[in-house]
Amino acid sequence: MCIIVILLAVVWILWSGEIRTILTIRQVGDNPYLYYMEYKASYDLDEVIAKDIDENAELLDYIVARIGKGLPIKAKSSQVADENGEVQTLNCTSFQARNCKGGFLYGRNYDYFANPTLITVSRPAKGYASIAASDMSHFGYSLDELPTSFKKKLLCLAAIYAPVDGMNEKGLCTSIMAIPHQPSQQNTPKHDVGTSVIMRLWLDRCATVGEALQLLDSLDVRHDASVGSGYHYMVADAAGNCVVVEFDKDDGWKTLTVSKQPEKNYMLVTNHLLSPKYYTTEPDPAVGNPNSRSWWRYATASEYLDAHDGVLSVDQALECLGLVHWDHLDLPNGKVEVTQYGNVYDQKRLTLRIRPWNQYDKYYDFEL
């Protein structure tokens, strides 16, 4: 009995945060592919930065080692390039608009395969609280492999490092959109961070767009070239400041930023570059993804936002996203894309409303 007590004490000492986190994981409502988690374990972004972890497999190995503390846990991401060396999915729509009730709304469609989604609330000891969405296929889950037992929930802990969009307690929001064939490969003496870690850093450490850009300038962002895609990001704060962050493929991947036009109440981004150096109103595979109808989505959502002068209710924000969502989009590589979810963050009231792909006529609400 004494040995058992000692072993239990050791387990609790080593994994108390992880255990307390796993105990919070639950299915949301009657949706078998939507989950919620409150992250209570420690994590060390400074260590990730110091190790220059910038590849997806490298990050997943680091996470698994940190979770397992020597135990043989395995995980594999589904986010890999096809036989042509590219990813033609992860094609999304994001916008910031004024909220008709005051403040700002941040709308987002996440277009990818039909995968389970995890909503994670984090309250780090040093940093801002946040709520974020993650595609669970990025850390080993699928429609056939779900977190239905304690053991199967272990890999949900990886979500803290892998948001695809989110909002923190200061109302700062961020999301990611794919740009095919253009993985940023910034290479200066600065430390490297990967695709999703920069977003976690923004959520944990930044209250404003200005702070987010300052943090960005202190690091090299390197997208995993093995995935076959690059990305740009939208960052928006509670005061209505909004930028799209891009990387200049023809000039050493220098950071480019596009700001919301002062005469507009909204800013919108899909899956083509907005920087004046590359922007075009006609589909061009050199600067975006025609396969996902990026330019059509941009024009369609812009028309709706212009018709409302960029001032929306939450329901209208969801309506706008609904105009450009996919039930079934056939891609040239033979795969089928859907809108995995559409969501709206209220940057003043700190709420999230989400519609998952398999219940797009229904929504779920969360509060930070």
What are these model-predicted stretches?
Residues 200-203, 213-216, 302:
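Non-transmembrane alpha-helical segments in soluble domains
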Residues 214-227, 233:
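Secretory/export targeting leaders with adjacent low-complexity proregions
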Residues 281-318:
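Long, charge-rich alpha-helical interaction segments
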Residues 128-140, 160, 266-288:
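A recognition module on extended beta-rich or small alphabeta surfaces enriched in W/G with H and D/E
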Residues 1-5:
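Hydrophobic H-region at the start of alpha-helical membrane spans
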Residues 6-207, 221-222, 306-368:
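N-terminal mature-domain region immediately after signal-peptide cleavage
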Residues 227-280:
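Extended amphipathic alpha-helical segments with heptad-repeat/coiled-coil character used for oligomerization
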